[in-house]
Amino acid sequence: MRGSWLFRSCLVRRSDGYPIERVQSKRIGRGCSKRLARRIEGSSMDERNRTPREQRERSTNPFGKALRGIFGSRFGLLWIIVGLILFYNLYAVFRPERSGPQSEIAYSSFVAAVEKGLVSTVTLSGQTIDGQFTQPLRVANGIVYLPGEPLPDTVDPAQVRSVTRFRTVIPENTQAEVTAFLQQHNVLLKVQPSGGASLPGLLLSVLPFVFLIGLLFLLGRNLSRGQQNVFSFGRSRARVYDVERPQVTFADVAGEEEAKAELAQVVDFLKNPAKYHRIGARLPRGVLLVGPPGTGKTLLARAVAGEAGVPFFSVSASEFVEMFVGVGASRVRDLFERAKAQAPSIIFIDELDAVGRQRFAGLGVGNDEREQTLNQLLVEMDGFEAHTDVVVIAATNRPDVLDPALLRPGRFDRQVVVGLPDKRGRAAILRIHTRGIPIAPDVDLEGLAAATPGFSGADLANLVNEAALVAARRGKQVVDRSDFEEALDKMLLGTTRSLLMSQEERRLVAYHEAGHAVVAYFTPGADPLRKISIVPRGRALGVTVQAPEEDRFNYTRNQLLGRLAVLLGGRAAEQLVFHEVTTGAQNDLKEATQLARRMVGLWGMSEELGPIYLGLGEQHVFLGREIVQDHSIGTSTLDRADQAVQRLLNEAMERAERILREHREELDRLADLLIAEETVGPEKIREVLGEQPVAAGDD
């Protein structure tokens, strides 16, 4: 048996007992050869000498493993080098020679150039002619301009090219005439067969695909050997900021002082945990940033990363879920394991609603993968050990769709509202965004903040950038007030359109906008007028802009009734002046109807129904929360609500008509001024309309 050449399976083990490889030995008595055993034992020693990170990368990176299998083989590397050299040589030998840019020219221009003796060589292939001029000639739009020939006025100089190589197509069945014509003018003629691919061209077309197929075959063969870890999707894709953290601090965030204070306390807890632990305080496990889009939730998280001296893991919630079942839960586990290993640390999850939606409890089938990811997130957040010093910060602009289990204390202990900034906050944000921009002394940031109610931090940053773009386009060295005004008009009203309107239509639009303005001017408590314009912008033919002097957080019934009258002022002016109404009031009617429905159904401001909430006019934000809304409201109550809405609109229309009849002269003057100047500011509005009534107290 000692000399037998039978094969036997042998399982080689490392020195630590872990099986390495199953090999075939030629001798039954001896087992595995000593040389093979030494080689495998050496490879196991190399594996143990690698760092944990290198071992993890080698085991979880299948593509890197495959490439090592290719380039680690002498024969595989040799074939790759031979293929590359062969492809390069074939391309270098058979590639067409180029002596300059080639241009398509007309056949008539080609004939004229031959007759002038300006064509040196020609290659004829079927109906296609490739040739070369004796000298560079000017070509524009397929026409060749001979030396000394002037360019027509209709030719754009930017389209003129100087070329030495050209291509043209000859008429059918004229090869014999063209050949004789070229020989007559002593042009060197070459003929190539048309149709069918030459051997060099075929090789150049096929070799890259053969090489690619071979490479993919080698990759697939190496991947199949380690199919257990072929897809390393289970690891979290969170980005870690430790040493190279974002250069954003709380000083770069303005307008959200309360949110900054909440997050600053979390940062201080992570930097100095001992002083909190001494008195038994527990670090909040989660902080949820809630607010509209563009208010700075992600910017606050970046500021936390810049302020905190601890590892900061940043990930988008959409990165958890993939097409494979269980990947999301695996990534959540991996993320929290990495964070716990480097505690104290912070995990930031952006757009939490991507995985934190309320779990499905209705008809049909829910999203099992997303729900598994959410369940794993709930377990990880609630399964922290005491004093692990790991904080989860999440951001969302859709808190109403989040699962209640995610919002309970013990998971997200704090909900920080990041709302729209007030006037003072907007001014501070503008000062931050204009730090690196040269602005003129006439720019009033306080006034600009007052003129932008409802703007978020992202809107204000865009406003400053748009103003800088306007100034750069005008060739200015600084950004002045006019640049900011144009940028603000562009954001609020849209881009100016070069729309040609007739005089009658301009007059109609002028009276429509003047009607809005006159009703707003003579309605006590209405917002001041900032601008009236009949210049078409966006989808509107004209616009009347009102801006409150101070931010408002509550509106009285009288203020809303005045707003209804202002919205219907344009339609009332059309009816009064032209005894006809147009389609220009469509958006006004839509806004007025929605406002009246909210007054009746949400705020209880109707005399017919009194203080009652019906849910009318409520904006149902997100589908999937409830398929059908259950209104336990009688039909008679809904009919009365519709009648109340109609009454509010009719009374507002009558009020607008009454104001316009009383101030018909001012209406005509303002409309004439708009026709003449197109855009009118607040100073000229006061000159035309006279003294404005003082706002009276509410009823």
UniProtKB/Swiss-Prot annotation:
Query: What keywords tag this UniProt record?
Result: ATP-binding, Cell membrane, Hydrolase, Membrane, Metal-binding, Metalloprotease, Nucleotide-binding, Plasmid, Protease, Transmembrane, Transmembrane helix, Zinc
First-level EC class: hydrolase
Q: Which domain of life is it from?
A: Bacteria
**EC number in record:** 3.4.24.-
In residue numbers, the region (Disordered) covers 40-60
Residues recorded as binding Zn(2+), renumbered to this chain, are H512, H516, D588
Q: Which residues form the active site?
A: E513
| Signal sequence interval, chain numbering | none
User: Could you say which cofactors this protein requires?
Assistant: Zn(2+)
Biological process (GO) annotations held by this record are: protein catabolic process; proteolysis
Which residues face the membrane's Cytoplasmic side?
Answer: 1-73, 220-699
Q: Keyword Hydrolase, does the record have it? A: yes
GO terms assigned for molecular function: ATP binding; ATP hydrolysis activity; ATP-dependent peptidase activity; metalloendopeptidase activity; zinc ion binding
Q: What residue spans carry the Basic and acidic residues bias annotation?
A: 40-59
Q: Its membrane topology, per UniProt? A: Multi-pass membrane protein
Record-linked Pfam families: AAA (PF00004), AAA_lid_3 (PF17862), FtsH_ext (PF06480), Peptidase_M41 (PF01434)
Q: How does it assemble?
A: Homohexamer.
Q: Which family does it belong to?
A: In the central section; belongs to the AAA ATPase family.
What does the protein in this record do?
Answer: Acts as a processive, ATP-dependent zinc metallopeptidase for both cytoplasmic and membrane proteins. Plays a role in the quality control of integral membrane proteins.
Protein name (Swiss-Prot/TrEMBL): ATP-dependent zinc metalloprotease FtsH 2
Q: What is the lineage of its organism?
A: Bacteria, Pseudomonadati, Thermomicrobiota, Thermomicrobia, Thermomicrobiales
Name the encoding gene, please.
ftsH2
